Every structure is written in structure tokens, then in C-alpha cells.
Amino acid sequence: MVQQQSASVETLKAIADAFNAHDLDAIMEFFADDCSLDMPRGPEPWGKRFMGKAAVREGLATRFKSLPDVHYSDARHWVSGNMGVSEWTLTGTMADGVRVEVRGCDHWEFRDGKVIRKDSYWKIVEKPA
């Protein structure tokens, strides 16, 4: 049985562009109503999970508040069937003034062309002692 591809590199690039524009409305157009988002930090082994479109929107809004100048660069994207991966370098300044630069990736799952799961990972950057 051939799996129908519902993800594309072009879609992942468009999502990245919306993130870099900090355009929450445009970002959310890519997400299904029953989507989920796993952020890299949080109280559980998977970070912090947001379930449903409204909760995902709030989680992303919080990200933009905590990293108001966040930018994703050096991106590479690929897809297989309904899954996609985006690798990137995230830069930004935390609300407390601390500058952040980390490599990370997003694992994406799509259904009917919409994101149903975004799972984000960041490298842990440790300053030398």
C-alpha cells in the first residue's frame, strides 16, 4: 500500500517563514483543530504539551513573549509521507535579557495537509566552567 504524502518541504518552509514573521494567525492556519505541540522545556520528559488549536496558539504566543526577537535560520527541511523534520538555528533574547543561540529541530506530523503534531527539540548549551 502506498502512503499518501500530506506534507511537503514547501509547506515546512512556509511555516518557518510565518514563525520568522511572528505571524501567529498565519502559523495557526497550518494547524488542524485537534493538533498538539510539545515544547522542549517543561515539567514532563516530553517538555510541556499543548492539546488543541487554542492551547497550541497560547503556547506559541507565550514563546513569542518569552523570546520576542526569536528567529530561525540555517534551516533544512525534509518529508516522508505524512511526517516532516525541520532543523534550524534559533536565536533570540529572553525576556530577562539573556541571549540564546541553539540548534534544534521540529518533528511534524500532518493529516490532510494540516499539522496535527509539532514536537520541538533544542540542544542544551552549557557555558564552560
Residue ranges and their predicted role:
Residues 20, 50, 90:
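Short glycine/serine/threonine-biased micro-segments
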